């Protein structure tokens, strides 16, 4: 199957590996030439994401997946053009926008900084019938718990409880709130399987998970393996409310939104829906637990999980 991928970021690096293994043919939509794609034998199309510049690359693709993550209005503008281009395309009638976070079916406004740029695109998809689409929900990526040499996913500093650069762990809430964790490579393998599902079989929301856990348990595993003695603290809901009241910059507001994302339990992916979608879409995909991935690092210390 010929698949277009909008954006060449961290997740796309896994896509270039796993989709090719699955037998799919890729074309990466990118604003600038990426020489590394040439060495992988992956096609690329230079675009400014205007509908006219997307017309030719999408003409012979069957599916478009966006990995463009942005918390500004640029996300809305680019994704609106991606939808319009798919509607004009004679073949590309399936679209997966860049979501890949929480249970946005139950918590559409989590994380808070996602809502304003993302919700107009969700509404645009709901209001049309030309394209088949789905919003993919995965919880948190497990990859942040391993050293950077073992992942394509970049560090996000204090926005993740395990702050490698800061050498500290800051856990929102009690740390016992349920959170689902999924490895990025498994998400991509799931996407490669999802696009092979029969036309008309996609649901508005698709759920994936490697395991249900919580921040206390997940960080305990990582601390034992990588950072014994690293300082650990918890941030209460009351403290987060205070952060929001006194925030003087966007970074503090975004950090508070990340804290609320965990405290609200929005990253607990519905177990019944995870199981239903494993049976419906992902019967050939193995979703690894956090411990599974850490064991793989032991066996292959220089591998990208």
From Swiss-Prot:
Name of the molecule in the record: Oxidoreductase swnR
Family under the similarity heading: Belongs to the NmrA-type oxidoreductase family. Isoflavone reductase subfamily.
Pathway recorded for this protein: Mycotoxin biosynthesis
Outcome of gene disruption: Does not affect the production of swainsonine.
Domain of life, per lineage: Eukaryota
Gene Ontology MF term list: L-pipecolate oxidase activity
Biological role stated in the UniProt entry: Oxidoreductase; part of the gene cluster that mediates the biosynthesis of swainsonine (SW), a cytotoxic fungal alkaloid and a potential cancer therapy drug. Swainsonine production occurs via a multibranched pathway and is dispensable for fungal colonization of plants and infection of insect hosts. The first step of swainsonine biosynthesis is the production of the precursor pipecolic acid (PA) via conversion of L-lysine (Lys) to 1-piperideine-6-carboxylate (P6C) by the aminotransferase swnA, the latter being further reduced to PA by the reductase swnR.
Pfam families attached to this UniProt entry: NAD_binding_10
Residue ranges of coiled coil: none
Reactions this protein catalyses: L-pipecolate + O2 = L-1-piperideine-6-carboxylate + H2O2 + H(+)
Database matches in Gene3D superfamilies: NAD(P)-binding Rossmann-like Domain, UDP-galactose 4-epimerase, domain 1
EC number: 1.5.3.7
Organism of origin: Metarhizium robertsii (strain ARSEF 23 / ATCC MYA-3075) (Metarhizium anisopliae (strain ARSEF 23))
Alphabetical UniProt keywords: NADP, Oxidoreductase
């Amino acid at each position: 199957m010929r698949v277009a991928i909008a954006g060449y970021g961290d997740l796309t690096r896994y896509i270039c590996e796993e989709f090719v293994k699955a037998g799919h043919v890729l074309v990466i939509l990118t604003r600038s030439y990426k020489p590394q794609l040439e060495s992988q034998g992956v096609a690329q199309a230079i675009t400014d994401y205007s509908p006219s510049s997307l017309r030719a690359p999408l003409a012979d693709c069957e599916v478009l997946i966006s990995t463009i993550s942005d918390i500004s209005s640029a996300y809305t503008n680019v994704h609106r053009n991606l939808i319009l281009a798919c509607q004009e395309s004679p073949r590309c009638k399936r679209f997966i926008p860049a979501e890949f976070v929480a249970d946005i079916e139950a918590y559409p406004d989590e994380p808070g900084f996602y809502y304003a740029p993302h919700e107009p695109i969700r509404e645009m998809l709901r209001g049309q019938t030309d394209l088949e689409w789905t919003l993919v929900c995965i919880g948190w990526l497990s990859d942040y718990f391993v050293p950077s040499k073992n992942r394509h996913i970049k560090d996000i500093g204090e926005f993740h409880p395990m702050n490698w650069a800061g050498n500290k762990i800051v856990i929102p809430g009690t740390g016992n709130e349920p959170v689902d964790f999924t490895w990025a490579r498994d998400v991509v393998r799931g996407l490669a399987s999802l696009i092979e599902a029969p036309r008309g079989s996609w649901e508005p929301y698709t759920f994936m998970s490697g395991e249900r856990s919580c921040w206390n348990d997940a960080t305990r595993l990582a601390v034992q393996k990588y950072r014994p003695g690293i300082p650990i603290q918890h941030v209460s809901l009351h403290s987060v409310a205070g952060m929001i009241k006194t925030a003087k910059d966007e970074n503090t507001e975004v950090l508070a939104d990340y804290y609320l994302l965990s405290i609200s339990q929005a990253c607990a992916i519905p177990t019944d829906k995870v199981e239903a979608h494993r049976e419906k879409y992902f019967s050939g995909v193995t979703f690894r637990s956090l411990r599974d991935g850490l064991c793989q690092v032991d066996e292959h210390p220089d591998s990208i999980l």
